[in-house]
Amino acid sequence: MVTVLNTVNQSGRLRHPEKAHRPDNEVLKKPDWIRVKAPVSRGYGETREIVRSNKLVTVCEEAGCPNIRECWEKKHATFMIMGEICTRACAFCNISTGIPNALDPNEPENIAKAVKQMGLTHVVITSVDRDDLADGGAHHFAEVIKAVREAAPATTIEILTPDFLRKEGALEIVVKARPDVFNHNLETVPSKYLKVRPGARYFHSIRLLQRVKELDPTIFTKSGIMVGLGEERNEILQLMDDLRSADVDFMTIGQYLQPTRKHHPVIRFVKPDEFKSFETIGKTKGFLLVASSPLTRSSHHAGEDFAKLKAAREALYASRAS
């Protein structure tokens, strides 16, 4: 793996040569339905202070999420564990790439403390890829889940994990910790993996999600994709079928937004009515829940969606019993 880093860029972020040496791509002007208001509120400031005081990293900031103001105003945040430097260089992602630092042994306790301070009823925990670790960070995920359970027993826990590619036994460690929701994003259709997500393997990710259900059928499974990367509609429908074949409960679909000129270009902005059609089709395919809109992101409205997931499962069980 190449370890020379490029830090000469507008944001000062670490840039893997694979990204730094890419030709510039035009950043298209966003249509009106993509733009979001950015109010600064007391809730936003309080959330930021809790994150800073506990020395935590959030994917909200690192990935430049368009929903950060809305979520932080409500004291919702997605914590990103195992540092802020990723070992992969996906073409869509704005997170820094390079050689990560050692794991912080105090991080599980700090995450749990922040969850309690914020009074979260549902927390989302994600991470960078840590291909440098023997278990891909599985034990660390389990320790964070354990710490949150001890500090806030009533809080439900959703994790958004990397693929643990070539990390034998890692998935079993995470599932054994019993998160309430296991999310692993496919990100895009298989034909786009070579350019968009070159370090990952589409069918490995499908199998990962399927294996979660085999290990513990009570855990909700979830996966998301971005659209606007040049995929065809029929490819999205086939991807839905692949997820359902893995018994995935919940799917999210959102518009890809290009972070910088060095990232994969937006091929097109998908219109809101197309997103609505994907939601309708997804429900007919058997998902318990489908969230599909231009600004949908994996963790957006995660707490509300968890309540909907539970209700949908209960309704399904009731219909089967009658």
Swiss-Prot record:
Entry-linked PROSITE patterns: RADICAL_SAM
Superkingdom of origin: Bacteria
Gene Ontology CC annotations of this record: cytoplasm
Binding site residues for [4Fe-4S] cluster 2: C86, C90, C93
Cofactor: [4Fe-4S] cluster
SS bond list: none
Compositional bias ranges of the Polar residues kind: 1-12
CDD domains the record matches: Radical_SAM
Record key words, sorted: 4Fe-4S, Cytoplasm, Iron, Iron-sulfur, Metal-binding, S-adenosyl-L-methionine, Transferase
Protein's name in the database: Lipoyl synthase
Gene name, Swiss-Prot/TrEMBL: lipA
